[in-house]
Amino acid sequence: MESMSHEADMAGLPVILLVEDNPDDVLLARRAVKKAALPVAMQVVEDGDEAVAYLDGSGQFGDRGRSPLPALILLDLKLPKRSGLEVLRWVRSQPALDTTPVVVLTSSSEDEDIQKAYTLGANSYLQKPVAFNGLVQLLGMLDLYWLRNNLSVPPAPAPAPH
């Protein structure tokens, strides 16, 4: 995978990749971003295989103008085809993505899930809020911390041609 900027889409907005299979949760997240007036572009994929394809820039996600690398990944754990933990393991094995912040956003509060997520390299593990306003607040805090205040590792330079 080629080295690309992880910071912005074509409009200059930071990109959040939401990996979520529940259409109701996707709709709530989109509404929460709008209500919080977050200056971000949200891309959504519905399962673990689609998340890997998006991040790898393969198939329908080959155009980085339309499918830019994210500045932040919001990852559910309970996904069809490939679990969130498997996606996280794959993300951390990719040099172009190994420093991209991954926030697990899930309904699971199982100690085993929490332990595995952190062991595999999650930057944060958050339980999905029950109330809509809680989600608005949570996304606002994530935006403020990960996309505005946190200093991330700059993307690695592209390797020199031989």
Where are each of the predicted segments found?
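Non-catalytic signal-transmission and effector/linker regions of two-component phosphorelay proteins
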Residues: M1-L17, P23-Q43, D49-V52, D56, ...
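Conserved phosphate-binding and hydrolysis motifs of nucleotide-dependent enzymes
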Residues: D21, D76, G84
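Conserved active-site segment of CheY-like receiver
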Residues: E20-D21, L105-S109, P129
